[in-house]
């Protein structure tokens, strides 16, 4: 296997090349604090504050015992508030577990509500203290192009967790990336098991195609990179 660092540098440089409104800036120099990421432009901030979750019907052991495989997703709508509450709780677990280190490299979950009840379909961002509507859903073909497999776009929702790799690099260099990737995977698997414990199904996958969400989720691959994802359905 060949390790071509020059090609990697060109890719990273391209991701951070800027746009018509924001000039490009260097990355991986340990100075993330001097170039804070611009705020995400949300269509409707604070559209929902999920309430406390009801008790799960199954504990972790029972959840593992009950798991089974399926080749298709159910077509019933997903209740939006419980789903968004599960995402928030998984994010809160990450914050409690890692404390100051989580604050240095915060995670940012996005939820594509494809077939919800109790909320409008759209792209949402989940925070510890609320939920923002980022924008409406794109066309179905666009969603299919974002995912690894087209059938993922037929789920009730897709949850992706993003991170600022520039901040992770400043925090710990290469270890910062591994730390952030591990936490992203833990959050997604935590959400997956919460969903399964409520009788839902889903598929964990490696995340959205970066080029497909560059504008849709304001993800340049450096200051915001979609790390890991999961589908959720009835």
Segments the model singles out, each with a brief description of its role:
Residues 1-171, 181-184, 203, 207-234:
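N-terminal accessory segments that position/regulate proteins before the catalytic core
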Residues 188:
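C-terminal substrate/ligand-recognition segments
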Residues 172-176:
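Short, surface-exposed loop/helix-turn segments at secondary-structure junctions
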Residues 199:
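Structured binding elements
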